[in-house]
Curated annotation (Swiss-Prot):
Keywords: Disulfide bond, Glycoprotein, Host-virus interaction, Lectin, Secreted, Signal. Glycans are attached at N119, N144. SUPFAM superfamilies: C-type lectin-like (SSF56436). This is C-type lectin mosGCTL-7. It is found in: Secreted. The keyword Disulfide bond applies. Interacts with putative receptor-type tyrosine-protein phosphatase mosPTP-1; the interaction may mediate the recruitment of Japanese encephalitis virus particles in complex with C-type lectin mosGCTL-7 to the cell surface. It comes from Culex quinquefasciatus (Southern house mosquito). Disulfide bonds join C59-C166, C139-C158. Carbohydrate-binding protein. Disruption phenotype: (Microbial infection) RNAi-mediated knockdown results in reduced Japanese encephalitis virus infection levels. One of its GO terms (cellular component) is extracellular region.
Amino acid sequence: MVVGWSLLGWALSWLAVATVVVSAIVTVDKEALTRECDPDTPMVVPNFKANWFKATEYCHYLDRNLVIVTSAEKQEVITKVLEGTDKFGDNSFWVGGSDLAELGNFHWHSTGTRIVWHNWSELVPMPTADDPTRKDDRCVLLSNNTEMGGFKWIVVNCWDEYYFVCEKGVFAK
């Protein structure tokens, strides 16, 4: 009986220590969560990386869509939003464009409209049907580096994980 109680005491002590350690490691940015859930915030950058599909799903969960970029002015607004986050140093963010329905025919997922205005990087070539190494590169990423001269668009594998930008939209609930 004594062994049982001392073993239980030891286990409870370790559980208490583990709880304190985990509590110290896991910090919650309450301000970011508030912004993310605030229906009046026009754009949010969730606090985790995801593949393009999961990012789309999460934005819908927030009654938003992956951001669409329809002009240089809109891209500048997005850039300013990103500069105001702690994610800016990551340099790459999912937006709502892809050519998943037809190779080379890019559309905005949330509206179904063809991408007219664009800001493709000249440094990263577009994938082609005859390049088997890039067959999964179908989703648009807003990527920033000095060689590209600021945020430019590139097409990458939709299953790669990046931060992403959600926005309130006409088609969001």
